[in-house]
Amino acid sequence: GDWFYWAFEVKGAAGKTVSFVMEPGYVGYFGAAVSHDLYHWNWSDTATAANSFTYTFGENENDVFFAHDMLYHPSRFHKFAELRGIKVKHLCDDNKGTPIPYAVIGEGKRNIILTARHHACEATGDYIMEGIIDEYLKNPIPDTRITAIPFIDADGVVAGDQGKNRRPHDHNRDYLDTIYNGVRAVKEIAGNGDVLAVLDLHSPWHISGRNDKIFCVRNSEEKLDDMRLFGRCFEESITPDAMKYSTKNDIDPGVEWNIGKERTSCSSFCRDIPGVELAFTLETTYFGEPGNVVSQEKLVATGRCFLEGFRNSAPF
């Protein structure tokens, strides 16, 4: 598949105005994401075309990070967990040795599994996960805990890989003939018999159309009514500080590219596990669009709304 993801650091350009050309055309509507610490990100708002942006470095601005989108560095998850009193544990080592962290939040007989970064570059899902966890801590779901795995492709995350369409297959096509340690660990947790839901958090394609929105990928005809109910409750739970969401952008099974029959993805594999009431993918845009522009704060707020929608839709 096409490789649209990029990130780099510029040193020693203080006082200069520089134009960056990213062929063949992978610059978002609002320019590059810009950071000085890999934690706080803003848009440059200087896209000159679909393939370029400019940046004027301040007189003392000697070290700047630029990226396709607002990255979510693993250190942010650890800092978030520390501030919230969450113990981060070691799930396993990835295939190249990178530790894969996870956290169990709350207590209860039932388990909600949150996964992100099956595709290494899809950082928006981690902001959503952070918001879900934050909302849960304020208002737990009775007798239900959360197992959060923020970096399934941990090797790819630390290497700066895009991760999608790896060969022989990527992490979200690994649930039958499993070769990745992180996926193997998810399958083990999901098979423990106590899982209520598996919520897999992704980012879509680079840009345009539905990719500028937030949308759910529904994957089960049998659970279609439950997933549509969740969508309505999620939409009703959206607050002014969150990204906009409408069920009209969701995609049903058998529509457009959502036609996979094999259970190779996380949500399609987990939907058939006995006891699992909901398993689906949430796709969260990298950029948004005018009037609905992605920011770190808005993504986290959207995660809070997501959990509220889940809570309000749960008939189980």
Model-derived features: positions:
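Residues that cap or initiate secondary-structure elements
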Residues: 14-16, 26, 59-61, 72, ...
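Hydrophobic beta-strand residues in large extracellular and virion-surface proteins
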Residues: 8, 18-20, 32, 146, ...
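Extreme N-terminal flexible tails
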Residues: 1-60, 64
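His/Asp/Glu-rich mid-to-C-terminal helical/loop segments that flank catalytic regions of hydrolases
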Residues: 289-316
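Active-site/substrate-binding loop(s) of hydrolase catalytic cores
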Residues: 88-267, 271-288
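Short helix/loop capping segments that flank catalytic or ligand/cofactor-binding pockets
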Residues: 74-77, 122-124, 290-291
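Extended acidic/polar, glycine-enriched regions
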Residues: 47-97, 106-107
